[in-house]
Regions:
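C-terminal "cap" of GNAT-fold acetyltransferases
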Residues: 163-192
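Short, small/polar residue-rich loop motifs at catalytic or cofactor-binding pockets
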Residues: 50-53
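Short amphipathic alpha-helix that is part of the acyltransferase structural core
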Residues: 1-45, 55-62
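A short, polar/charged loop-to-alpha-helix boundary motif
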Residues: 37, 75-87
Length: 223
């Protein structure tokens, strides 16, 4: 297997500082296209804080600056997926272990490989946690076409307003994680070698993860 080292590292967010760095990346990336969302994305949200999702952060090796981030929520951890709070998933989907990728963000001017390796982090995290499928929301036709080229299929015919994305309308798409390797191999997909035939030592899926701090003890003063 080929080994590829890159100019950045990807790790799970493991501290409040790293979570804030992820929010900086989100605010810059989304705020570039949606200035009205920049403020909302600059702070951790409830899903970041409840411990039911894992956020990965890409850090430039030279500058130490945060340059990319993605968040993955698993249905098996007991929290309703964000898009399913705005959209009624079909019964067949609700029976499957599934993951939602949100807040995919890369700063302007970053290495194009950052987004690819964030996708690999999401894919392998799903495989490691035995997810059957992955779901995402996409707004722009160009982005929907990108997802379709990866093997995503539409679950909606009309866009759905997402409460967690400023009520902007999104299409819901999904793909089967469990069969992806075989399908990409059989179709000679252009990313097969990168995703399944290359070792990336700069990608760490299972390092320390951020956990919500326990509540401070309440001091009881004798009456």
């Amino acid at each position: 297997m080929e080994t590829m080292t890159l100019g950045f590292r990807i790790r799970p967010v493991a501290s409040d500082v790293a979570l804030d760095d992820a929010c900086v990346v989100r605010a810059e990336s989304y705020g570039h296209h949606l200035p009205e969302m920049k403020s909302a994305y600059s702070e951790p949200d409830d899903l970041d804080r409840d411990g039911s999702a894992t956020t990965f952060l890409a850090i430039d090796k030279v500058s130490g600056a945060p340059i990319g981030s993605v968040r993955i929520q698993l249905s098996t951890l007991g929290s309703t997926l964000l898009l399913e709070r705005s959209w009624a998933a079909p019964d067949w989907l609700q029976t499957l272990p599934r993951a939602e990728l949100t807040r995919m963000s890369v700063v302007s001017g970053a290495d194009p490989m950052v987004k690819l390796l964030l996708w690999k982090a999401g894919l392998y995290y799903c495989l490691a946690n035995q997810m059957h499928c992955m779901v995402i929301g996409a707004r722009k036709p160009a982005l929907i076409r990108q997802y379709a080229s990866l093997g995503f299929e539409p679950l909606t015919t009309e866009p759905v307003p997402f409460a967690h994305a400023g009520h902007l309308p999104h299409h819901v798409l999904w793909f089967n994680v469990a069969t992806l390797e075989r399908r990409w191999y059989e179709s000679n997909h252009r990313l097969y070698g990168f995703m399944f035939g290359t070792h990336h030592p700069d990608l760490d899926l299972f390092g320390p993860r951020w956990r919500p701090s326990p509540p401070a003890p309440v001091e009881v003063v004798p009456s």
